[in-house]
Amino acid sequence: MKIFSAFICLLPKGLQYAIGTLLGEIAWLLVPPKRKRLAIGQILFCNITDDPKEARRIAKASTTRFGRMIIDVLRYPEIKDGAYKDMVEFINREYLDDALENGRGAILAAVHSGNWELLGGVLASEGYPLISVAMKQNGDADKFINEYRRLMNQHVTYKTGVREMINELKKGAFLGLIMDQDPGDDGVLVPFFGYETLTAAGPAVLARMQDVPIIFVTIHYSPYSGKHEIEVHPPIYVERTDDKKRDIAVTTTLLNEFIEDYIRRYPEDWFWLHNRWKWTRRFYGEQIETPPDVYQ
């Protein structure tokens, strides 16, 4: 991959992204039919559209965009020393600056929408004390992506204990947590697209314990400006009452409402190939209504 990255960095920008477009089309061709059915089914069940053809278009667009994402990452050696600034535009950056000045840390919540890898790299390169909490992947893939993350001054830690995360928050760190995927049995059951859905409770739990804000930061590529728009959203604070479970559920519901609204705004940007209701269906399928299991 590093050889391919070096080759990409030698090419004109237009050719770089033409290759990205080709890679995205190839990726869609390689997606198994049952995974395509899953993506299309979830789009329909979430009422993004009621037209199967439009659902297929959205599913394809949400997959082919990975070609451009890959090119953005492969360009890290080319953009790491400040050239990335020409690729992005910040909206409402003051929310991050206020949290940084406060010095008490923050939870930066993100979703698998747009180029979340570039988002983390840009925030770290801009001097924000970001620690991205990730899941460990394949050894070779991990080695490559972490080496490239370091090019953008990004620090990544694998999913770790609450105590370690709290220690980082006490140092004033921004903990980056992606919270839109199926958390398995670690989640809390709250509404999402009209269905009770297991959802990651980590952001609400940590924010409540340390009384720090949860700040959603999103990224969307605008074909009109030719830039990635990094939008920082108003901070969310967890209400602290005597009922801890209620506080976490209420806040996680608010977070899901934000994610749902954002996905409806940019449906082609989200990762529809992910089986979002897999564990909800497995644990609660006979007790509550869930989207039909189309992944067969």
At which residue positions do the language-model features occur?
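Membrane-anchoring hydrophobic helices of lipid-metabolizing enzymes
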Residues: M1-A110, I145-Y148, N153, S222
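Short, flexible segments with low predicted structural confidence
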Residues: G14-L15, I71-D72, G120-G121, A141, ...
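Active-site metal-coordination segments of metallo-dependent hydrolases
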Residues: R35-L38, M135-G139, T197-A200
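Short, flexible loop segments at the rims of nucleotide/cofactor-binding pockets, characterized by
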Residues: A83-V88, A134, L151-T157, F192-G194, ...
